[in-house]
């Protein structure tokens, strides 16, 4: 009987070593989610900073001859400051970039010192949703301006300008694209942290 008990004890010990305990598995899953959260926030910072720099440098001056007056050439500048929608996108990129920096630091501390309280995680979800809405609205507004600059609008007699201001339009288009990526990243962060809250509530 002693031999059987010893064998059973040894077998159960092997099973314990082979399968991790539920708390250990939960901690590993939590760290995995936190790592994904940190990677997305670093990506968000890089994207918003790049979009901010690209949009802030969106400026071009072209020399356009006046057909009615031979020899007269006008210097016509194009700046992002000329459009309220582009200014809105710049502000949205700026505040989202600052938020991504703060949230990246917070997530790094969470990885170092353990999981954060559910209340803090819930606030993080709310902020992610808030900034996702800001970025989506700003990107949509700027995208409308960029489309008119690219294609024009014959119904309102708005002429396209991208055939003249090529560099300026490339900057605007790139910043709108980066703003769209930032919006998608924020949505992914919202889903990820909402899933973390769901795991804790089970």
Curated annotation (Swiss-Prot):
GO CC list: plasma membrane
Transmembrane region positions? 38-58, 86-106, 120-140, 172-192
Query: What residue ranges lie in the Extracellular compartment?
Result: 59-85, 141-171
> Which residue ranges have biased composition labelled Polar residues?
1-15
Q: Which InterPro entries match?
A: CASP/CASPL (IPR006459), CASP_dom (IPR006702), CASPL (IPR044173)
What keyword terms does UniProt attach to this protein?
A: Cell membrane, Membrane, Transmembrane, Transmembrane helix
Region named Disordered: 1-21
Annotated localization: Cell membrane
Q: Which residues form a coiled coil?
A: none
Q: How does it sit in the membrane?
A: Multi-pass membrane protein
* Domain of life (superkingdom): Eukaryota
Q: Which residues lie on this side of the membrane: Cytoplasmic?
A: 1-37, 107-119, 193-202
Per the record, the major location class is membrane
All disulfide bonds of the chain are none
* Quaternary data: Homodimer and heterodimers.
Q: Which PANTHER family match?
A: CASP-LIKE PROTEIN 1U1
Indicate the family of this protein. Belongs to the Casparian strip membrane proteins (CASP) family.
NCBIfam families linked to this entry: A_tha_TIGR01569
- This chain belongs to the protein called CASP-like protein 1D1
Q: Please spell out the taxonomic lineage of the organism that makes this protein.
A: Eukaryota, Viridiplantae, Streptophyta, Embryophyta, Tracheophyta
């Amino acid at each position: 009987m002693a031999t059987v008990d010893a064998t059973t004890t040894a077998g159960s010990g092997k099973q314990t070593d082979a399968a991790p305990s539920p708390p250990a598995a939960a901690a590993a899953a939590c760290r995995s989610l936190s790592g994904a959260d940190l990677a997305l926030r670093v990506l968000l910072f890089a994207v918003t900073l790049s979009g901010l720099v690209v949009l802030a440098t969106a400026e071009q001056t072209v020399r356009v001859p006046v057909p009615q007056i031979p020899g007269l050439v006008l210097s016509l500048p194009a700046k992002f400051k000329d459009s309220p929608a582009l200014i809105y996108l710049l502000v949205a990129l700026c505040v989202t970039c600052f938020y991504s920096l703060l949230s990246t630091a917070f997530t790094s501390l969470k990885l170092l010192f353990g999981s954060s309280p559910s209340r803090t995680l819930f606030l993080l979800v709310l902020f992610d949703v808030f900034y996702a809405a800001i970025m989506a609205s700003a990107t949509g507004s700027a995208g409308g301006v960029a489309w008119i600059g690219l294609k024009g609008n014959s119904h309102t007699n708005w002429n396209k300008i991208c055939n003249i201001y090529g560099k300026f339009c490339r900057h605007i288009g790139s910043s709108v694209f980066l703003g769209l990526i930032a919006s998608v990243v924020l949505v992914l962060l919202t889903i990820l942290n909402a899933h973390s809250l769901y795991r804790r509530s089970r």
